[in-house]
């Protein structure tokens, strides 16, 4: 029986058709359409990683055809109009050859035209990248000319571990890339999220894969990350004030932190929290790597046109939208527009401190609208909630200024737990100021306390230690410290929400 003619499409090349030919799972003469080669050449020149991998597979098919004594031929068609897959189907229809693919749509269309189809099935073996991970591995880093390394541990507490002692070659990394790209059609929840000149981002099940190649980088590089922790909101051991605010009041939420500190993990927990409260939750991600219940719709920013997500979210009316990885002006503009439209927003940004995260909004909006857009800022460090700010607006004389006619709208950034202002945001002249007021408040409070106590006990001294005001009374003036003074100090504590302690010479604080 003569060998059949096999015409692979791009998906078959990416899946590694040569492996099936070599182990005789599939047998036949190999036909490569000229239109496919032209498309791959153009894409390779544009820097697409998938095209280069596919061209390497064509070369491999030619090599094994010589060893296996099967024909390898470049074929062409008279009619090259239409899509590549359409041209391949037309050729198979006219020449009675078999199309080889991993694409279900290609298979269905070919079968409807009575074209023989071979749908490549995935191998049952464990993926190479899965062997690089254990239960503590956060990410694996592969770079041409460097030994493979893994980051093991948890956010904020990890170490870099060498996986092998031998440096990787470009061939080693291409083999890993080939396996990743060939698995996209078979591994659940997998897709190529972004493909640009020199870079490709793939979501492969739980793994997020970033592939970089020359000329964008100085060599082939693959970074594979995987979430090591999935937590419920209740597992963060948050203060009840924060939990109550998230449940009842917060609608303009900003989650900030350094890369790898657990921001997305917290955002994921928050999205599930609102879903359990029967809220309609949607996400905007790039890439889509959050693992959420099916009730949550996840949108990709990369596949949407400008304005498309804005229209979709306004018309679908979610209660909350999680915006993961806000980076550029377009991201912040969409967050602001949706929040002002009344949609609850949860934004995730990179920042080294919570005030830095707020600063990224300052030049994009009017100061008077800040609390309407941002009401709660959560700073994540080492996988835990490290700081929470609430934002409110008032009209007052900014702390540190004295003249009454300097009163103006001031946004107070308060520690949510202690309810004490730590920063004030206001316009001074033409510049928007972000002023730390904690020390300023301490100094002014201390001055008022000194004035009051020195009118009664002239030689008493006041210091601020460990969050308390310490009044030290000299031995010869102890008699002036009476019930009247104690009453005044208690009223002062209550009025200014501070703690005062009195110290006598050679005695412990009282």
Swiss-Prot record:
Disulfide-bonded cysteines: none
Enzyme class: hydrolase
GO molecular function, a single term: ATP hydrolysis activity
Keywords from the named record: ATP-binding, DNA damage, DNA recombination, DNA repair, DNA-binding, Hydrolase, Nucleotide-binding
InterPro entries: AAA+_ATPase, Nucleic_acid_metab_PIN/TRAM, P-loop_NTPase, T2SS/T4SS_dom
Catalysed conversion reaction: ATP + H2O = ADP + phosphate + H(+)
Gene inactivation effect: A single deletion is mildly cold-sensitive (growth at 55 Celsius versus 65 or 75 degrees). No change in sensitivity to mitomycin C. Double hjc-pina and hje-pina mutants grow more slowly at 55 degrees Celsius and do not grow to the same cell density as wild-type.
UniProt cross-references to Pfam families, sorted A to Z: T2SSE
Gene Ontology biological process terms in this record: DNA recombination; DNA repair
Listed EC numbers: 3.6.4.12
Function per UniProt: Important for growth at low temperatures (less than 65 degrees Celsius in this organism). Promotes Holliday junction (HJ) branch migration and unwinds Y-shaped DNA (but not replication forks or dsDNA) in an ATP hydrolysis-dependent manner. Stimulates cleavage by HJ resolvase Hjc. Hjc, Hjm (Hel308) and PINA coordinate HJ migration and cleavage of replication forks in a coordinated way. Probably acts as an ATP-dependent pump that pulls DNA through the hexamer.
NCBIfam families: PRK13764.1
Complex and partners: Homohexamer. Interacts with Holliday junction resolvase Hjc, interacts with helicase Hjm (Hel308).
Protein name as catalogued: Holliday junction branch migration ATPase PINA
Taxonomic path: Archaea, Thermoproteota, Thermoprotei, Sulfolobales, Sulfolobaceae
